[in-house]
Structure formats: structure tokens, C-alpha cells
């Protein structure tokens, strides 16, 4: 159905008298993210079976992981913005539980608290934007808002709503200056880093930008802000990655830089709303490139994180100054690392 451009909408009544229902909206974008969430999530679950010790609280770990997976699916499938926000905050809560899984490590607790504070505050910003949008469009439905986009653009709340939504997206996807939570979150178990911080949670902000672009792209402020913030994030994080000596630290800043690249591509794609014909198609290529690299990054960066976990288990260190000669002792991992690194 979605291959032919059609969409699937399913409504589950919850509080219809105030316009809050579970409106599930399935199109190409939501299917793509759903496949990433469930596909890579399944691989991470299989990986964690061998990675985590049987003496650890595996039941709790899998419960937290599946809770996060369900929350992410709720984010990408919700058409009602209030429901999307509830799932959005649930991803922050479940990620806190996962990052702090090794509670005996103070660094894990600190990283989890930092992540929770920044992403929850960003979520509150998003909630403010949602409320202002609902005042302008008299609905919480994203698709209905797109149909009423002229009313929203003429509303006095338009600019403020746009800024608040962008802040919510930037905090979740670790854009400058909100990226500071992601490196500290690397104290989580490697399966968590592979899943949350390369394939899913950090992609939620990118999903929100892509989903809300039809509403806000008419504003040059939306286009320029997304593009410039993405480019600044790309270069700043790339520079910081070269200074790291911990493998996960390198991957953390590399992830931030790639998120910035995808964000800037979405900004370039949003320019298509200002042109018609051939000129529009040129900028649409930015959207296509963003989605392609989103899939590419989620797949191969997740693999790099899991290989890093294998190196840590085998050698007892992630310090690149102490690692050498891994080709002879881990030839398969070396080959996979080269392939996945080249994809970046």
C-alpha cells in the first residue's frame, strides 16, 4: 500500500472528548524508522546475550530495552502530537534506565542523569511548541496541521512554535550546543550505545524534523537554522573525534558529526518548498541523501559499536594507544571494522 504512495491510518479511542486518541499513521517515513527500530533492536538483543554476564540482571535489561523499543515505535507511528510527546518522554526515561544499568559505576549514573535532564528539558520545549501549534490549527493531528498549514503560518504563534520544536529536536539528536550529553552516555553497556546512540534515540530528532518540515519549511528561518546547526555540529564533532583516545569516545563524536550531516541534508531538502519544477527536484535530493545516510549510519555505526564491545571484552581496554596488532588476533572483527568504517 505505501509503495504506491498510499498511507494507513488507524485510530484507537482514548480520550476523544479532548481530541486525544492513539492515531497511528503509517507511510514510507514511519515504515523506514519502524524497520530500523525493530530490525537493529533484534540484532542488539542477540548481541547482548553473549556480551552481558549471566550474573547481571538480564531480565531488567531486556525489559528496559523492549520498553525503549516500544516507546520509539510510538514516536514514529503517532499522528497525534500529544501522544507523540508522551512516547518521546518515555524514550528519555527508558534510556535513563539503560544508561545507568551498571549502577555501581558513578560515571554511568552521571551520564544517565545528564542525558535525562537535557532530553527532558528539550521535550518540554517540544511540548510548548505542540501547544502553540494546536492553538493555531485547533488540532493535535500532524496530517490535519499540514492541511491547515496556511492558518498556522499566519498565526502569531508560528515563529515561537517553530523555535520550540527545533530545540526539542536538537536536544534529542545531540546537535550543537546540546550534544554534551551523548559522550557521557557512552558509559552505558555497549549494546545500549549501539542501539540508542547510533540507530534509534538520536534519530528521533531527525524524524521530528522530517515530519514537521511540511509545516515549517515555508519559513526561511527553519531552512537556515536546521542547515547551519547541522553543519556546525558536523565540523565541531569531527574535530573533537580526532582528540579522543577511547574507542567509544571516538564513535560518540563521530555519531554526533554524522547526525549533524543528516540534519544539514534535511535543511537543504527543505529548500524544495520554496521552488517549483526542476529547481525543487534538485533540493529534494537533499531529503533522499538524508534518508539514505540515516539508514547507512544506523546500520554500520551500530556494527562499529558492537565490534568495539568485542575488542573491549577480548583485550580489556578501549584505549587506542594500547591497541595494536588486532589483525592477527581478531581477523574477522578487523575485516568487518574496515568495511563498516569505510561506509562512514
Give names to the regions the model predicted.
Residues 1-344:
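...captures the hydrophobic TM-helix bundle architecture rather than a specific catalytic motif
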